[in-house]
Regions:
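Catalytic cores of carbohydrate-active enzymes across secretory and cytosolic contexts
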Residues: 1-530
């Protein structure tokens, strides 16, 4: 029987913390159906670059640097011979990275070169001479591991920018299986690829996949332009929505490569189930039956601390809004959940410091003189003090406003998926301010978690991939403060009937292009490859 093999940079092991939902849960369910294999980095860094040195992994296995550990998780009953039923188990194959691989492959080429390039921030590219070689070495490493256990009918699904070259090395090793690639982040226009001297080789490597998927039609168009520029395909044909390129990859026959957009979705039914009891549990709220939301309103924003997410632009525009509409002071609250990320990279550490300073400065700006705390007077960023006055994320109802008002409540804690969905339910506005984003599932989860009788409003950046599908949101340009201010005012004053109509239109789209259809559409095209 054909098995599905998923390769992603990080693997969520079943014996660690529960999977928070989204892609991890979806891939788990998909892999169970075919006794599939999930392969990738376990998140650990080996103690040294010497492959003779070993490290003990979380699951209790002893692993050498770049020696792969196999772990099988079964949820089935035992068969008559005492073996788990094969259709209900997943095999996890993971490895640690060596310190040099972490520095040059992960921090270096993947996140200091490809990430800024694909997000059209080439001014932020930082590259050491060893970075590209390490990137290729790690891609080759995973291809070699695939070679060890691949079976003739297996299908390989590779995820994201960390592995542009894996298919190339698989073909070099004689692997002829179907291999698909899905890019979760944007595909940059040609002019950005032309600024990287390694682009011709990377695109040549990318052409060894059978199916390449992007998040949006815009990204697909960029991908096709880049492919045609570097590969000079002998033909380009269209079959339905997909484009097929015939390219020379040095094999015995021309290679056919399919490129299409497969917008990732969310599990709407599961999210709605998580919040279904809230309408019965929540305390009475006087504005629930009015046509206009009450003055005391909650805005929620959830982001990794990344320069692509537009956090500083959000805070700046929010400050302008409160100045232009002072009646919202002491009423409107922005709850920012911001997860620190990649702090080993200097650009991220600077951004992290700037985000916290900006939160502090805005809260100081809108405090009365008699309310200024010692930490404010000292001009320091006291994160603990900021969080002390933040409302409980599960209490984003009117009760939260009984506490002293501050403009921004800031949280760096990792929240469970259930807690986050409940927070969305309680919020009046969900704010996505991305400067560039492949999709942004927060936007989709926010809509899925809303109370249809009194839905909140989605404030959505035009530069998020989700905007291509979610035009019923209030679309803003995060690079234009006036656009954000106007969008906030529109969202805060929107009548109930309009909120309902917009929410229903957005929800219908989510149900049509959901997480399951994303998987099915991509894999259907991949399985059709001959």
């Amino acid at each position: 029987m054909s098995r599905l093999i998923v390769l992603s940079n990080r693997v969520k092991m079943p014996d660690n913390n529960p999977m928070a939902g989204g892609l991890a849960v979806a891939l788990s369910e998909l892999l169970k159906e075919s006794s599939g294999i999930w392969m990738g980095w376990n998140g650990q860094i080996a103690e040294s670059d010497n492959t003779a040195d070993s490290a003990v992994l979380d699951n209790g296995y002893k692993d050498n640097s770049n020696e792969f550990t196999t772990y099988t998780k079964s949820t089935s009953v035992l068969s008559s011979v005492g073996c788990p039923a094969s259709t209900l188990e997943i095999t996890y194959i993971t490895t640690a990275l060596t310190p040099k691989q972490y520095e040059h492959y992960y921090c270096g080429f993947a996140n200091n070169v490809l990430w800024p390039l694909l997000h059209e921030q080439t001014d932020l590219i930082r590259q050491a001479p060893e970075d590209y070689d390490s990137y290729q070495s790690v891609n080759r490493l995973f291809a070699q591991q695939l070679k060890q256990f691949i079976q003739p009918d297996d299908v390989i699904w590779v995820h994201d920018y960390h592995f542009l070259s894996v298919a190339y090395y698989c073909r070099q090793l004689g692997i002829t299986n179907r291999i698909g690639f899905f890019l979760h982040i944007p595909f940059a226009p040609l002019k950005f690829w032309q600024q990287l001297d390694r682009s011709p080789e990377l695109i040549k490597h990318l052409s060894h996949y059978d199916v390449i998927g992007t998040q949006t039609q815009h990204d697909k168009a960029n991908c096709l332009t880049v492919m045609q520029h570097y590969l000079k395909p002998s033909s380009v044909t269209q079959h339905g929505s997909a484009h097929c390129l015939t390219v020379d990859i040095g094999s015995s026959r021309p290679h056919r490569l399919t490129v299409d957009a497969y917008p990732i979705g969310v599990n709407v039914a599961k999210i709605q189930q998580l919040v279904s009891q809230l309408s019965l549990e929540c305390e009475p709220n006087t504005h629930k039956n009015t046509h206009i939301k009450a003055a005391a309103q909650n805005i929620i924003a959830v982001d990794r601390i990344d320069y692509s997410k537009g956090l500083l632009e959000r805070f700046s525009a929010y400050s302008v809004f409160l100045q232009q509409y002072p009646n919202y002071q002491n009423q409107l609250k922005l709850f920012q959940i911001a997860c620190p990320s990649r702090l080993d990279l200097s650009v991220y550490q600077r951004l992290y410091d700037n985000v916290r300073q900006s939160v502090h400065d805005i809260n100081q700006q809108f405090l009365g003189t008699d309310e200024i705390s010692e930490s404010v007077k000292l001009g320091s960023v006291d994160l603990e003090a900021i969080n002390e006055t933040a409302p409980s994320i599960e209490g984003l109802s009117t009760a939260a406003f009984k506490r002293r008002w501050q403009a921004i409540s800031y949280c760096e804690n990792v929240l469970s998926h259930e807690t986050l969905m409940k927070a969305f339910w309680h919020s009046d506005i969900g704010w996505v301010n991305s400067l560039k984003d492949g999709m942004n599932l927060v936007a989709k989860e926010y809509i899925a978690a809303q109370n249809p009788a009194n839905p909140g409003v989605l404030l959505l950046s035009r530069y998020a991939g989700a905007a291509e599908q979610m035009q019923a949101a209030v679309i803003i340009d995060p690079q234009q403060p006036d656009s954000i201010v106007q969008g906030l005012n529109t969202a805060l004053s929107m009548p109930l009937q309009e909120r309902k109509e917009r929410h229903q239109a957005l929800l219908n789209g989510l149900k049509q292009d959901n997480l399951q259809s994303w998987q099915q559409d991509f894999l259907e095209d991949l399985y059709q490859v001959v």
